[in-house]
Amino acid sequence: MIGLGSYGYTAPSSKKINAYDVPQGVDIRGRFDEEFAKILTKDALQFVADLQREFRNHIKYAMECRKEAKRRYNEGALPGFDPATRYIREGKWTCVPFPPAVADRRVEITGPVERKMIINALNSGAKVFMADFEDALSPSWENLMRGQINLKDAVEGTITFNDKARNRVYKLNNEIAKLFVRPRGWHLPEAHIFIDGEPATGCLVDFGLYFYHNYATFRNTQGQGFGPFFYLPKMENSREAKIWNSVFEKAEKMAGIEKGSIRATVLIETLPAVFQMDEIFYELRDHSVGLNCGRWDYIFSYVKTFQGHPDRLLPDRGQVGMTQHFMRSYSDLLIRTCHRRGVHAMGGMAAQIPIRDDPTANEAAFELVRKDKQREVKAGHDGTWAAHPGLIKTCMEVFTNNMGNTPNQIETVKRDYASNLTEDDLLQRPRGVRTMEGLRLNTRVGIQYLAAWLTGSGSVPLYNLMEDAATAEISRVQIWQWLKYGVELDGDGLGVRVNHVFGRVVEEEMARIEREVGKEKFKKGMYKEACKIFTRQCTASTLDDFLTLDAYNYIVIHHPKDVSSKL
């Protein structure tokens, strides 16, 4: 058993060298910074490299399996339950008991790994803060490395933020939320770190650096002997969950901590994964603390999965809520599966932002939040997500009024009738209409989000909602689907085809964006670049899997031109 930090490297020379000290085969191409170097230590990089070398072929195979599944769906196949794993779905087994530290997860707040956000979220009164390296973060080198620094300071309890504009210093309260961290998905590379000549896997960098620097402190201060805790995004099947389980076991072994110390909640946010929830649990049964309804990404995945199916066109995305039969079925089956296996079933995001200058609109927004959370807690969810500290009190009141002092509903709400849900229930076509305003909203929100992402912001307030990459993705794929199949806008009496008006809509929405943000900000921002990327993706003959994979090429900066590490 090898304790982390005992790889046997000699102490670095006191001579100042403006390059990262790296183990063999590792090449850092991001900008050198002395603060970053405290994260990118030789031992930490060796740990990441060990993970990359052991699991890269498994990851590549999993990505090839995704391509093969996409080919089948495009040829007319439908996702469904796997007959070969029926014994797992029908078996009477449970995941290991959840740690006492996370028994109560009534309200969780999410946000990027930015310094002020971390402090405000941990102080918000929420039970959990999910610090995000994924959809709420633009993965620039600066954001990723500063995020690791910020989390290390947060785990140690020393994090502060001096807001000079407000003449205020932010620091942690005595009581704070439990910290979960969401690394990137399997598909995203980290192009600033090369291992053996190829880009590292983004999630292994996020997980590896965070785990290496924080596991010991976290277990003492936050986890009550368990942890660290994670959220795992974008998985499509149990094969991908098995890789994560192996990563966790390797990390635990190398750190010399008990098997099952690391715990993770999996986001069910792809359509194929809803048919594999039991199987995902089975692979992660020693490390699982539940599932979460990632509903925006789930709708995005519905379109992506059925990109070759002209009979499964979505209405305006605003009409695809949790009352649609296929969405309610997904939620009910998730709750039933989680509680049957003894773990938490987490509800979806409340993305509203308090509207301070309009009390009437603000109350209407909060009423929407209350209704959504009331639906979730009545359905049996054990907790929910909020994107803004101002929503925590409202969400907490709804869950507490329904649950009392019980920390969760795992034993009290079983949703057994959901065992009768069929593949048809989970795939039922959504109902609704398509409108010009739906097309316009998708266009301007998609472009504005992408413009912010390209300039370093992954969590973006737009029209009183806190948006992340999932919103841009659903906006993009919905327009792509409507264009590909020549959809008619049937909801507002116009009767025009999207293909005939999209070019004009883009021009008019760009003009509207310029009016709304102001000419100076529009000129300095990357709105025109974002518009080119977004419209190219919407009009492409084949649908790209992820908008952020394409856009990532625009934010990768190598310093210096050749190499930034001491080999």
From Swiss-Prot:
Keyword terms of this UniProt record: Glyoxylate bypass, Glyoxysome, Peroxisome, Transferase, Tricarboxylic acid cycle
Motif Microbody targeting signal: where in chain: 565-567
One Pfam family matching this protein: MS_C
Primary subcellular site in the record, as a coarse category: other
Residues annotated as transmembrane: none
GO BP of this protein: glyoxylate cycle; tricarboxylic acid cycle
GO cellular component, one term: glyoxysome
Active site: 182 (proton acceptor), 468 (proton donor)
Catalytic activity: glyoxylate + acetyl-CoA + H2O = (S)-malate + CoA + H(+)
CDD domains to which the protein is assigned, alphabetical: malate_synt_A
EC code: 2.3.3.9
Family: Belongs to the malate synthase family.
Name of the protein in question: Malate synthase, glyoxysomal
The organism's taxonomic lineage, starting at the top: Eukaryota, Viridiplantae, Streptophyta, Embryophyta, Tracheophyta
